[in-house]
């Protein structure tokens, strides 16, 4: 891929072993070219997208939630001008690293988003969903979807209008139900990470920060928790971390401690053995630095900040930017390398048609020891 020739490696400094002069192994982050090519083929599926948020299914395979995406064929790294873009889809990858297809409404010649807010049918404004995160329970995929409408001018004139849970039937990928759980007045964008631990589902979100120049100050991390209610077939009452314990009052939600960077809109929290790991890209314009933190509890405090990687695209081309790094721990390999990714996009809306790699995610392999030690 064209963009891959710019990729950089971040290494931990070589250290001398105690009592000797044998250097320890240098740990490096590398681009996973094979997974990058597997995830985004040139035909027969979604061929350009952002989002790239994975949900592990009960059978060991994974569904990746995409945001805005294209399904048209790619020829010589290009796509036809004016090809239709849809706002969400699912990409299915097997545990054995096989591409199992993609899911959206319609046909490759005339595709539509897999799910659409009910408001789209009645509002004079354009409404759409971008993905949060989700989980499987039985034959249903429960997806937190962030709802937006076009409330301003230009490509950045979108407005957040709440968070819905969309139930998708895994037998045929039809939408079974839609329920609004937070309206547009909610200051926290809940549902951008879901982690199951013990009997709880931990639901994470960030409070959208005020932008000052290129920085967002702040964009802290919040967490709630709930259990699945078998009677209703949905999540039960939520509790919110208030800085000391758990409260039923959403207004009592307090930011998790230990973080000194603005957390990106989309991020990952997962459990590895007895350790909780947060992976996030710093939220700032043209920021490419990807960090990890660890904690002993799902709510922090977070510690052990590690700069894992700096994306090169925004420095190689001022029209490009990268964002929303995500972790996919179900694909940790035998070398104990975590699979992560970040999204690439362009301020020039024509570039993704002329070079599809300017609107495709890049996958990386990160040694777990870089995060844990």
Region spans (language model):
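Long, low-complexity, proline- and polar/charged-enriched segments
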Residues: 190-198, 205, 209
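C-terminal motif of bacterial Sec signal peptides marking the signal peptidase cleavage site
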Residues: 16-17
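Surface-exposed substrate-engagement region within the catalytic domains
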Residues: 308-311, 321-322, 328
């Amino acid at each position: 891929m064209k963009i891959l020739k710019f990729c950089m490696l971040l290494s931990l400094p070589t250290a001398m072993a105690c009592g000797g002069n044998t250097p320890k192994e240098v740990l490096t982050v590398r681009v996973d070219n094979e997974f990058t090519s597997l995830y985004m083929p040139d035909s027969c599926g979604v061929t350009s997208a952002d989002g790239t948020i994975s949900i592990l299914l009960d059978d060991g395979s994974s569904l990746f939630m995409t945001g805005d995406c294209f399904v048209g064929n790619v020829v010589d790294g290009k796509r036809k001008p004016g090809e239709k873009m849809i706002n969400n889809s699912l990409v299915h990858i097997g545990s054995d690293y096989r591409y199992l297809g993609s899911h959206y409404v319609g046909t490759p010649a005339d595709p539509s988003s897999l799910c659409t807010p009910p408001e789209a049918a009645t509002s004079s404004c354009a409404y759409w969903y971008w993905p949060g995160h989700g989980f499987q329970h039985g034959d249903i995929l429960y997806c937190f979807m962030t709802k937006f409408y076009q409330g301003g001018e230009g490509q950045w004139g979108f407005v957040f209008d709440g968070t819905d849970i969309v139930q998708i039937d895994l037998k045929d990928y039809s939408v079974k139900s839609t329920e609004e759980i937070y309206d547009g007045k909610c200051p926290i964008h809940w549902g951008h990470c879901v982690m199951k631990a013990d009997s709880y589902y931990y639901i994470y979100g960030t409070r959208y920060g005020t932008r000052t120049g290129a920085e967002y100050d702040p964009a802290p991390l919040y967490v709630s928790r709930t259990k699945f209610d078998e009677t209703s077939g949905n999540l039960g009452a939520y509790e919110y971390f208030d800085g000391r314990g758990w409260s039923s009052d959403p207004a009592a939600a307090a930011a998790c401690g230990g973080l000194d960077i603005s957390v990106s809109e989309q991020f990952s929290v997962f459990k590895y053995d007895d350790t909780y790991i947060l992976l996030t890209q710093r939220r700032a314009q043209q920021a490419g630095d990807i960090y990890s933190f660890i904690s002993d509890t799902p709510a922090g405090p977070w510690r052990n900040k590690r700069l894992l990687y700096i994306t090169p695209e925004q420095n190689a081309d001022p029209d490009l930017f990268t964002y929303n790094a995500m972790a996919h721990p179900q694909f940790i390999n035998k070398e104990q390398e975590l699979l992560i990714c970040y999204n690439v996009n362009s301020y020039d809306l024509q570039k993704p048609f002329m070079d599809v790699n300017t609107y495709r995610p890049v996958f990386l392999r990160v040694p777990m020891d870089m995060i844990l030690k």
